[in-house]
């Protein structure tokens, strides 16, 4: 382990651990690095993933859980304490046959439509990339990938809009605080369930990766079909006094 007392001068380490097991301090498991250890984090699929899952679900119009998930990958970087994969591909299938693929490429890889982080949507006549923030986009059509409407296309192509989403972080935060103060979820411009559905994709992907097999998921019950081992990973063992009740 890596020990440096200076890191803990202003930190309540027991509180920082929360429900995770009480283990000696290790700087490699601490701020930000916690993402890469199962006791605290969910890898980059749970770190960057939900940002992109939101956009993907909007584009696919999916307000439900997938019915199956398959996931493969591994850690292929230099020797480290990291437990989560740095290379990770997951495929989700929905009840209507829609297939959604998510990939984390921790090592060398190609760009996709000039984007290293973002979403790609494929249709019958072409495809579209959307950047990681959802603010730039570009469409292409036909076998020659001719540019259509988008952030990089001239107006003569059928219209050019520099933004898919308008930046409204300030109003977004204010809306969240207003909803808390009003104790009324209806005040929210984006419901809590949206965050749950996007975050669940990361958890489903990681569980399929950890058990090493394709899984069927019952979205209504929020349980795996006939897989007790996978079901155990839907929650965790909570360390007292940081336990959370099954019903909150």
Tell where the protein language model's regions lie, with residue ranges.
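Contiguous beta-strand/loop segments that form the cofactor/metal-binding neighborhood of enzyme cores
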Residues: 1-248
